[in-house]
């Protein structure tokens, strides 16, 4: 069950530090192993996201009605979106050495989700938390604290760039749908 957050403000600043060379290598090594199973990992991430935060489905007419995780896993539309999400993440991870490229990719993602899809930016933070959960589970025995911190730093960097794009296009926080409350951020984690 979701909790309704207090005043969720886009103005709240996330830490946005560039990753060190060691952090980039740690993220890229983990990512390479995840990306080898791109579609399955992406589907696992989105299914968990939609099961734990069902209000996020409001932005997806093609599968907003789905409640059963197995039905979601089999959905061609969900699988396609999972591949798009993983592809965007792959572009970011592969270009961590190039801050301008990372910024450009995340600006495009942020602007599209703000202008075309009207997605509340908090869902990026929630989704990135789900991604970290899945990574931690996939590499339960091989996810040292340093790598976890590097991924947490990347999470902040992604959210910072995406919310900057929302601000750039003049995003105004949407009034929550009364039948589907917005999700809160997970209380645990970095």
Curated annotation (Swiss-Prot):
The keyword Plastid does not apply. Residues 1-21 are annotated as: Disordered. One of its GO terms (biological process) is fatty acid oxidation. InterPro entries: Globin (IPR000971), Globin-like_sf (IPR009050), Globin/Proto (IPR012292), Globin_lamprey/hagfish (IPR013314). GO terms for cellular component: cytoplasm; cytosol; neuron projection; neuronal cell body; nuclear speck; nucleus. Pfam families: Globin. Disulfide bonds join 38-83. The keyword Cytoplasm applies. Heme b binds at residues 81, 113. One of its GO terms (molecular function) is peroxidase activity. The formation of an intramolecular disulfide bond between cysteines Cys-38 and Cys-83 specifically enhances the nitrite reductase activity. Keywords: Cytoplasm, Disulfide bond, Heme, Iron, Metal-binding, Nucleus, Oxidoreductase. Disruption phenotype: Homozygous knockout mice display marked vasodilation with lower blood pressure and systemic vascular resistance associated with increased levels of nitric oxide. Residues 18-167 form the Globin domain. Monomeric. Homodimer; disulfide-linked in vitro. Also homooligomeric in vitro. PANTHER family: CYTOGLOBIN. Probable multifunctional globin with a hexacoordinated heme iron required for the catalysis of various reactions depending on redox condition of the cell as well as oxygen availability. Has a nitric oxide dioxygenase (NOD) activity and is most probably involved in cell-mediated and oxygen-dependent nitric oxide consumption. By scavenging this second messenger may regulate several biological processes including endothelium-mediated vasodilation and vascular tone. Belongs to the globin family. This is Cytoglobin. It comes from Mus musculus. The gene is Cygb.
């Amino acid at each position: 069950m979701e909790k309704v957050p207090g005043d969720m403000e886009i103005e709240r600043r996330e830490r946005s530090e560039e990753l060190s060379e060691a952090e980039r290598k740690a993220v890229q090594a983990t990512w390479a192993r995840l990306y080898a199973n791109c579609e399955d990992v992406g589907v696992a991430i989105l299914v968990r996201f939609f099961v734990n935060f069902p209000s996020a489905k409001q932005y997806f007419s093609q599968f907003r009605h789905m409640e059963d995780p197995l039905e979601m896993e089999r959905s061609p539309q969900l699988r396609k979106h999972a591949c798009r999400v993983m592809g965007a993440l792959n572009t970011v991870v592969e270009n961590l050495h190039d801050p301008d490229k990372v910024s450009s990719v995340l600006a495009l993602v942020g602007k599209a989700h703000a202008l075309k899809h009207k997605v509340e930016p908090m869902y990026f933070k929630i989704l990135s938390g789900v991604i970290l959960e899945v990574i931690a589970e996939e590499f339960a025995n091989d996810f040292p604290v340093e790598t976890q911190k590097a991924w947490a730093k990347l999470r902040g960097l992604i959210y910072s760039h995406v919310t900057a794009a929302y601000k750039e296009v003049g995003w105004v926080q949407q009034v929550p749908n009364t039948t589907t409350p917005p999700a809160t951020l997970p209380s645990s984690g970095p």
